[in-house]
């Protein structure tokens, strides 16, 4: 989402206190550290991987967008297998200041600060982390006896063309995305939704309204939870953490809760699995994500049916 922030922040702070700074041999990795595809190159060199190298910079949807790109490459027959991932280490003053000035960070310093869908929510809690998945064509995976955790049914992404950060409270943009995503399906039945659930006033209402518009009364029967309630918002990798959480719900038949949901918001009145996990068979799951720049992405994941099922 924001590149090599630690290196850039260090150099920026150095420039502030030293007008005559000289870039010397010690700065040989400064350029590499700021490039978005440096991680790709280092991983491929370490693992001996060749082929397509792509770095997506789509903000907080980037991890899921990488999954979508890999999925489309495999569907088109261009790849049999690929590794996709997202990584973010934004915990530096430079990032805090940038996000704070637009008012999206929580001002709450307690352990309950990340509280998606709660009346008490007032911004997200920034975090860091890396998430990676191996995507593979089904027969290719079966031929090498790989463990298959789940199947990608479909992916789609849109831009709302509205605002860099603001979201319309009616949820229509996410609703339009879901209409496109589900167009190929004969039904809209979903067992679980892993929401973007960022703990901001705008986003959580935006998603809630979108779900209501698309699923109608059935939405009250679908459990929804936010991974960010427990691990914060890790920007680009957050959407992929959401996908992994949904995959593990499919594998384990357990849905993690939205913690810190102790004060209900009457406008956010769906089943957000408050505070305690639940046991439920999950045959398919929807994961949604939104990012600065007006990007909205979503993916449907499903349980793999073995031969004879």
Predicted regions and their residues:
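Condensing-enzyme catalytic core mediating Claisen C-C bond formation in acyl metabolism
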Residues: 110-192, 306-309
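Active-site-proximal gating segment of KS-fold condensing enzymes and close homologs
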Residues: 4-54, 96, 101-103, 203-217
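Acyl-CoA/ACP chain-elongation machinery
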Residues: 79-102, 106-122, 155-169, 197-204, ...
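Glycine/charged-rich beta-loop-alpha catalytic/anionic-binding loops adjacent to active sites
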Residues: 19-29, 46-56, 111-119, 159, ...
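Active-site nucleophile and cofactor-binding loops and adjacent substrate-binding regions
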Residues: 27-37, 54-62, 226-236, 261-263, ...
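Stable alpha-helical structural segments in soluble proteins, enriched in small hydrophobic residues
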Residues: 66, 177-185, 210, 214, ...
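Flexible, low-complexity linker/loop segments at domain and module junctions
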Residues: 187-188, 220, 269-309
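Active-site-proximal alpha-helical scaffold in enzymes
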Residues: 36-39, 44-47, 53-87, 125-146, ...
